[in-house]
A protein has these predicted regions:
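N-terminal glycine-rich phosphate/adenylate-binding segment common to multiple enzyme folds
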Residues: 1, 13, 107, 111
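Glycine-rich phosphate/diphosphate-binding loop of Rossmann-like nucleotide-binding domains
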Residues: 3-84
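Residues at structural and domain junctions
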Residues: 17, 48, 89, 155-159
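Active-site rim loops that border cofactor/substrate pockets in soluble metabolic enzymes
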Residues: 55-102, 106, 111, 135-137, ...
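Glycine-rich phosphate/nucleotide-binding loop
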Residues: 93-168
């Protein structure tokens, strides 16, 4: 399927995002499965009022999988699936005491996890675990890298990055 995104009259730029329904379904099942395993509520947020096709597809797939595959189990466990816009989710998360899983698309999760970790303590106290639908786990540094020091290093400037500083 082809669709015109924008007809430029002059210089400009387009940002494109893609995903497959199969991949979104896999992500949704991993989230719902993790919520069941940990017996925690699952919150999911997008910005489907702006991204009417891409984000709305995520919202619809999550809802369909919840309704058809997980609703009864959630009710049995006394846990809840909750969808809201990401800006509403941010406000709710900041006011909350935690105890739930917040499922986000990749970019949203990357940014929001840093925000939450900083708001409630320190990036060094945060974990980052990627869980595949088949149960494979990948652990990574949650706090990212020191990009500005790397760019200084490339210019031949001295840096003072102290990796031990993140250890408590």
């Amino acid at each position: 399927t082809r669709e015109l995104i924008h007809n430029f009259d002059g210089a400009g730029i387009i940002q494109g995002i893609h995903n497959t329904n199969k991949s979104i379904e896999s992500f949704a099942r991993a989230c719902f499965g993790y919520a069941v395993d940990t017996k925690q509520d699952l919150w999911f947020s997008t910005k489907d009022t702006i991204s009417k096709k891409y984000d709305h597809t995520f919202k619809d797939i999550f809802q369909e999988i919840y309704d058809n595959e997980y609703k009864a189990k959630f009710e049995e466990l006394g846990i809840e699936y909750f969808y809201t816009l990401i800006d509403d989710a941010v406000a709710r998360v900041i006011r909350s005491e935690g105890g739930f899983i917040w499922a986000c698309k990749n970019y949203d999760g990357d940014v929001m996890s840093d925000m939450v970790a900083t708001a409630y303590g320190d990036l060094s106290m945060m974990t980052s675990v990627l869980v595949s639908p088949s149960g494979v786990y990948e652990y990574e540094a949650a706090h990212g890298t020191v990009q500005r020091h790397y760019y200084k290093h490339l210019k031949g400037e001295e840096t003072s990055t102290n990796s031990i500083a993140t250890i408590y």
